[in-house]
Amino acid sequence: MTPPKRRPSSAWFDDQYNNRARIPEHLAILQHWADASAQARAQLTSVLDVPYGSDPSERLDIFPAAPTGGVAAGALAPVLVHIHGGYWRALDKRDQSFIAPPFVAAGALVVLPNHALCPAVGIEHIVMQLVRALAWVYRHAAEYGGDASRIVVSGHSAGGHLAAMLLTCEWCAVAPDLPAGLVGAALSISGVFDLEPLRHAPFLAPDLKLTAASARRLSPAFLPAPRGRLVALVGADESAEFLRQNALIASAWGPQVLASDAVPGRHHMDVLNELAEPGSRTHRWGLQLLGLDLLDAKPSAG
């Protein structure tokens, strides 16, 4: 469903985009993420809070690939950089460490970066922080067993937006040592690709401080299709607007979008859980983008 021709009411935008209000069990889900993430950090080999910049928010957590994973002995591991959600104003990298264990076990180096939060900074500032984070990962991945030529970015919700933005980055303009294809692929889960509607959602707009111009400038759907590949997934039980957002990026970027699927039986929050569930379609897409799907087949619809 697309929005009516006349701009809907503020209440309509809040209903479509305020996912915590739409999901009564959101507190239990957030607690599950926190508990599972604490367990992951306790069990995995890790290097935590590594600076990628000078600001205190510019830190990342690194989880090296398991030696028994799907990478040949002595070979460098593909790198998965995962960006947390929270509408650019909430949550922390530590809330989503739980996605790391199955990818580490499969042979990937997993990196979770932090960034500053709105309203202290704007979304454009956050995008540039993540650009610096990815540049750091490219330059230092080998120190942790990672292959800098095989970087994939995943993200949930606002993190899905940031993952798509990183695909569009002109890396050679950032620094001469960075390759044009620094990010080879991205997996966006419940991403936001058109930011204009967020300007009209009272629960969110004051923190984001978007203008019509900045919303368009920061909307992946209105940027040229990148060289890298995108998989865009959304929960089938999400709001009509999130389903529209997912269809929009597929239409805008065309063949660069490998899939723009709705995951059955999942809403905006529990759709992320699938990333950490081996055998799920979402996890299989992650493996395939990393080159770790040994079956080398498109994930099934189930």
Per-region residue spans from a language model:
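The feature captures the conserved acid-bearing segment of alpha/beta-hydrolase catalytic domains
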Residues: 177-180, 184-203, 210-248
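Short beta-strand element of the alpha/beta-hydrolase
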Residues: 74-86
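C-terminal catalytic histidine-bearing segment of alpha/beta-hydrolase fold enzymes
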Residues: 243, 247, 254-302
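N-terminal cap/lid segment of alpha/beta-hydrolase-fold proteins
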Residues: 12-72
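Hydrophobic beta-strand anchors of alpha/beta hydrolase catalytic cores
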Residues: 80-82, 110, 230
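Alpha/beta-hydrolase
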Residues: 83, 189, 263-266
